[in-house]
């Protein structure tokens, strides 16, 4: 099990990323627009830099939904490899069967 503080910190980052997503996308579009004047682009990049650091989606870490483990996760299931194996062997994941050839 991961520390509760690190899991909660990640949840806070997810909330902030969702909250600021529209504003961040709008500013990024202006900053990357070649048609806009250099002053507008520079102003947009300054406003983008003023946004909270944790509002960037890249700061969110993929964690296991069950244990909070940060490494060895499968995006499709949002589970770490350990819990995926455990739940699959119990038959809890629909359509997943043990491979044999």
From Swiss-Prot:
InterPro entries xrefs: Ribosomal_uS14, Ribosomal_uS14_bac/plastid, Ribosomal_uS14_CS
Entry GO terms, CC: cytoplasm; small ribosomal subunit
Database matches in SUPFAM superfamilies: Glucocorticoid receptor-like (DNA-binding domain)
Keywords, comma-separated and alphabetical: Ribonucleoprotein, Ribosomal protein, RNA-binding, rRNA-binding
One GO MF term: structural constituent of ribosome
Keyword Cytoplasm on entry: no
Secreted keyword on record: no
Any one GO biological process: translation
Pfam family, one: Ribosomal_S14
Superkingdom classification of source: Bacteria
Family: Belongs to the universal ribosomal protein uS14 family.
Quaternary assembly: Part of the 30S ribosomal subunit. Contacts proteins S3 and S10.
Purpose of the protein: Binds 16S rRNA, required for the assembly of 30S particles and may also be responsible for determining the conformation of the 16S rRNA at the A site.
Protein name: Small ribosomal subunit protein uS14
Organism: Paramagnetospirillum magneticum (strain ATCC 700264 / AMB-1)
Lineage, broadest ranks: Bacteria, Pseudomonadati, Pseudomonadota, Alphaproteobacteria, Rhodospirillales
